[in-house]
A protein has these predicted regions:
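Helix-loop junction within the histidine kinase core
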Residues: 23-34
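Short helix N-cap motif at coil->helix boundaries in the Bergerat
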Residues: 39, 120-128
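Short alpha-helical segment of the dimerization/phosphotransfer core of two-component systems
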Residues: 7-12
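Bergerat-fold ATP-binding/catalytic subdomain of histidine kinases
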Residues: 25, 128-139
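Short helix-loop "hinge" at the ATP-lid/N-box region of the Bergerat-fold HATPase_c
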Residues: 89-90
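Conserved catalytic submotifs in the C-terminal HATPase_c
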Residues: 33-38, 55, 60-70
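Conserved glycine-rich
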Residues: 160-161
Length: 180
């Protein structure tokens, strides 16, 4: 009973935090504490923090953060974006699957690709995936606020970047954070 209660309390806490941040983003009240940051180091830290969750679920988490990616941004908010992308990939990947996180420079931008072997996202759901409170038509078993990707995309936009999606049902998804 205690583990279930702890899990539910954690969900309510995350929901409250997400609602608060979403409201602040909507009202343009989020200020970035910008400085030089190393996107590959932030990515490595997030992946390290998610390793136990992936192992517990039976998901292999692979990382390739060897490419130096200096960016100008708010390290806390960048970690928040990466945390959302990596934990989503773990949640939507079945046991025995794999999540791969790769840092690379592409077309003069710093990019982090988070690719999973999960269920994928139906083409009709893809245009709405960054919308507030959105859940895919196939998502019936995951606790979610429906705000994580919205918040991640809005934070990426504050950094003058974006999150791109490539997905195929039954084959998985790839979310790519790209920053100038």
């Amino acid at each position: 009973l205690l583990p279930v209660l702890q899990e539910r309390v954690g969900f309510v806490r995350r929901l409250t935090e997400d609602l608060f941040l979403a409201a602040k983003l909507e009202q343009k009240q989020v200020l970035l504490n910008e400085d030089r940051a190393r996107l590959e180091a932030l990515t490595a830290a997030v992946c390290s923090a998610c390793q136990a969750e992936a192992a517990h679920k039976g998901v292999e988490l692979r990382t390739d953060t060897g490419t130096p990616l200096p960016v100008w941004g708010d390290a806390v908010r960048l970690e928040q974006i990466l945390q959302n992308l990596v934990t989503n990939a773990i949640h939507y990947t079945p046991s025995g699957g794999r999540v791969t996180v790769v840092c690379a420079a592409e077309n003069g931008r710093a990019c982090v690709k988070v690719t999973d072997t999960g269920c994928g996202i139906a083409p009709e759901d893809q245009p709405a995936v960054f919308d507030r409170y959105f859940h895919t038509t196939a998502d019936t078993k995951h606790d979610s606020t429906g705000l994580g990707l919205t918040i991640a995309q809005e934070l990426a936009h504050l950094h003058r970047g974006e999150i791109l999606l490539q997905s195929e049902p039954g084959r998985g998804s790839c979310f790519t954070l790209c920053l100038p």
